[in-house]
Amino acid sequence: MAKLTTEELLAAFEELTLIELSEFIKAFEEKFDVTAAAPVAVAAAGGAAGGAEAAAAEEKDEFDVILEAAGDKKIGVIKEVRALTSLGLKEAKDLVDGAPKPILEGVNKETAEKAKEQLEGAGATVTLK
């Protein structure tokens, strides 16, 4: 098997859907017995006091947009999920049907709030973490 360069690997990952990439990460974690979770989150959760936690929340610059429920207008929510993530119809429907699920991960505050507004406008229940 030929060794792939970093650029070739990144090009291959760019072609994957969000769901395919998530499945790859899970398989990678299982194969090599590692986790993709940020070690900072463990340290912050373990020793943070109430005041320190509030200060950390204000400084947070990466957010996850979590779809809690699709609501009554599932078709509109699926359309918004597709627009935000570039997923195909089936992948977006599966993601919406499997709520609660993350729609976007590690995005800036402005992008997260805009996505939340669009999804809520379509009838979804959304949280930012």
Swiss-Prot record:
SUPFAM superfamilies the UniProt entry points to: ClpS-like (SSF54736), Ribosomal protein L7/12, oligomerisation (N-terminal) domain (SSF48300)
Keyword vocabulary terms for this entry: Ribonucleoprotein, Ribosomal protein
Keyword Transferase included in the entry's annotation: no
Gene Ontology molecular function terms on file: mRNA binding; structural constituent of ribosome
Coiled-coil region(s): none
Pfam families found in the cross-reference section: Ribosomal_L12, Ribosomal_L12_N
GO CC list: cytosolic large ribosomal subunit
GO biological process assignments: translation
Quaternary structure and partners: Homodimer. Part of the ribosomal stalk of the 50S ribosomal subunit. Forms a multimeric L10(L12)X complex, where L10 forms an elongated spine to which 2 to 4 L12 dimers bind in a sequential fashion. Binds GTP-bound translation factors.
PANTHER family: 39S RIBOSOMAL PROTEIN L12, LARGE RIBOSOMAL SUBUNIT PROTEIN BL12M
Similarity comment: Belongs to the bacterial ribosomal protein bL12 family.
Function of the molecule: Forms part of the ribosomal stalk which helps the ribosome interact with GTP-bound translation factors. Is thus essential for accurate translation.
Protein name from the UniProt record: Large ribosomal subunit protein bL12
Source organism (scientific name): Micrococcus luteus (strain ATCC 4698 / DSM 20030 / JCM 1464 / CCM 169 / CCUG 5858 / IAM 1056 / NBRC 3333 / NCIMB 9278 / NCTC 2665 / VKM Ac-2230) (Micrococcus lysodeikticus)
Gene: rplL
